[in-house]
UniProtKB/Swiss-Prot annotation:
SUBUNIT field: The complex is composed of two ATP-binding proteins (CmpC and CmpD), a transmembrane protein (CmpB) and a solute-binding protein (CmpA).
Superkingdom, natural source: Bacteria
Biological role: Part of the ABC transporter complex CmpABCD involved in bicarbonate transport. Binds bicarbonate with high affinity.
Region described as Disordered: 31-52
UniProt xrefs under Pfam families: NMT1_2
CDD domains, per the entry: PBP2_NrtA_CpmA_like (cd13553)
SUPFAM superfamilies named among the record's database cross-references: Periplasmic binding protein-like II
Gene (UniProt): cmpA
Identification of the protein by name: Bicarbonate-binding protein CmpA
Presence of the UniProt keyword Cytoplasm in the record: no
Compartments reported by the entry: Cell inner membrane
Keywords: Cell inner membrane, Cell membrane, Ion transport, Membrane, Signal, Transport
Amino acid sequence: MGSFNRRKFLLTSAATATGALFLKGCAGNPPDPNAASTGTNPSPQAAGDISPEMMPETANIKLGYIPIVEAAPLIIAQEKGFFAKYGMTGVEVSKQANWASARDNVTIGSQGGGIDGGQWQMPMPHLITEGIITNGNKVPMYVLAQLITQGNGIAVAPMHEGKGVNLDITKAADYIKGFNKTNGRKFKAAHTFPNVNQDFWIRYWFAAGGVDPDTDIDLLAVPPAETVQGMRNGTMDAFSTGDPWPYRIVTENIGYMAGLTAQIWPYHPEEYLAIRADWVDKNPKATKALLKGIMEAQQWIDDPKNRPEVVQIVSGRNYFNVPTTILESPFKGQYTMGDGQPAIDDFQKGPLYWKDGIGNVSYPYKSHDLWFLTESIRWGFHKNAIPDLDTAQKIIDKVNREDLWREAATEAGFTADIPSSTSRGVETFFDGITFDPANPSAYLQSLAIKKV
């Protein structure tokens, strides 16, 4: 299994086994025992006027999703007929029980009863391509679009209120690092899947405040149900989580929000659409048709007047199966932070899907892939498979298919929104650190806490 050993593989599967389902359980709805395989039936809508040269090779594909706000473009493209508009009338959007299940299902593909692709934390497509998290089984994948920016945050248990454990934890670093001296255990934090987005966000937050997430605290992959219960009873201290969890955690007095990822890295890359390379290579026109449908869905979602309908659709029984009240505030960019912090009421700090304050959200910048793999190197993840930045760049060039995104956007008439470069340029984090994709080694050198 390379750097992802069998024990960690099994622990990860167990740790994420109830991740998506707990959202339903906490809302008062019993978890669906068939959640890993439930999904929508192929759309019955007829395709619009499509020229022969753009007619998809197939109308059928099975896309997996996790019931969190990152999945909205897939769901809306299906429900509002954007997939069907471009000839993809046989799309099945299939709920996955957790990230481990999605990983396993894409490995076997839809013909084996799995999925062809769908929604992914980064850099899962790269890791699956290299066989790093699939027991050495290399399944080439293509990253095709970014689904969303923002929509995540760091939750903290109420026992730490008033201790300075907020966005900037510099002054609370000694309190966190010395927690074992007064409490008989280290400060404990959790995420739902290792070495990907939510792990990276909480690691960056700790390290920016002078806390080493590998030595000063216990950082674990833990199911949300267990994590939230731990926050209630005082055995879990922090949690890297995504919408609608920030809303729930504060309103249900489970804890408070130390900060949003929108504050840690404004307009950061989040989750992506990625599909098996063999499917894309066989069906390039269908791939672009999917992309066009998702692009239209992203634009539709980002119109504030459509957000109430977005909430109605994604909260429905076929998808998230939660009360609409749980999703209304996050989709407005409204967050009650707790611990005496001012509330946030800013549409630009909530989940965005097509445009943000920098440019296009949907376009899969190679520079963002590079940050995810550079961060992997920073923390010493997958040393054998990704030993250096040159290897990382080669993997990105193999996996990232921004060229297909450009072609699809051009064919759909979205030329004004096509970025001029595969790099978004220099990125700036809340602690003043910058990441220049033209010089990622300088970023690594600038970091005080790292494993390289």
